[in-house]
């Protein structure tokens, strides 16, 4: 639809701007000022490589611990399927979306090389998982942005399944809705709720540009106190 394509163009422009000028610290500062004090994912969710960046819309995925019960009965046919709905979730990724997964115990890998390859075909922006990732050499070779607890090969197949996607999820107390904007860099991952994104990014750009001026002044010899009193930035 025309509306859909206009939104895509607007998102593309916004994402380009975020990657060029913004970073998690300045975006987080603005959300703090606006009273949104719990928008950072926990600090152990880190990029697989320090220079990896993510900016894109959340495609939320709900995982749960499920003992591999394909041989047993049970009342939910979904749980008889390998990986549950993971393959459907992966195939549903759209351009500039981020596969973000939470809900399970942090005891196994929720992302890997083949998932990265498929996500790249969908033109996804990256993956953020509340757990480990594996096939690390392969993911790094693909240069696909992945944020996780780090490398650990123990697989989800006999331990967990995707039970739903494009539903609200929680990552250590941080609510993530499908379509929220996710920004990730070496300092972590922050979640910008869609309803406040316009104000957040407008103010973050202003602050980022101000910070560059303050940096220049400090490098020219200005004292920290004077810089803060004059610019209100530190």
Predicted regions and their residues:
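Short, small-residue-biased leader/transition segments that mark boundaries at the very start
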Residues: 1-9
């Amino acid at each position: 639809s025309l509306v859909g394509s206009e939104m895509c163009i607007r998102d593309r422009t916004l994402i380009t701007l975020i990657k060029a000028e913004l970073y998690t610290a300045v975006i987080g500062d603005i959300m703090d000022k606006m009273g949104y004090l719990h928008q950072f994912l926990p600090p152990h969710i880190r990029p697989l490589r320090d220079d990896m960046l993510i900016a894109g819309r959340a495609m939320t995925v709900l995982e749960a611990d499920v003992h591999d019960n394909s041989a047993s009965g049970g009342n939910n046919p979904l749980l008889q399927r390998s990986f549950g709905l993971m393959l459907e979730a992966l195939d549903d990724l759209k351009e500039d979306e981020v596969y973000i997964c939470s809900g399970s115990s942090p005891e196994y890998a929720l992302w890997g090389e083949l998932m990265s390859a498929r996500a790249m075909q969908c033109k996804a922006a990256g993956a953020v998982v509340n757990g480990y990732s594996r096939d690390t050499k392969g993911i790094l070779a693909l240069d696909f942005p992945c944020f996780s607890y780090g490398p650990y090969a123990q697989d989800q197949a006999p331990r967990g399944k995707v039970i739903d996607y494009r539903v609200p999820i929680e990552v250590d107390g941080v609510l993530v809705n499908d379509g929220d904007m996710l920004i990730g860099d070496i300092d972590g991952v922050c979640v910008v709720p869609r309803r406040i994104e316009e104000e957040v990014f407008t103010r973050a750009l202003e602050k980022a540009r101000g910070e560059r001026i303050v940096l220049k002044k400090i490098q020219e010899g200005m004292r920290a106190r004077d810089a803060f009193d004059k610019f209100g930035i530190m």
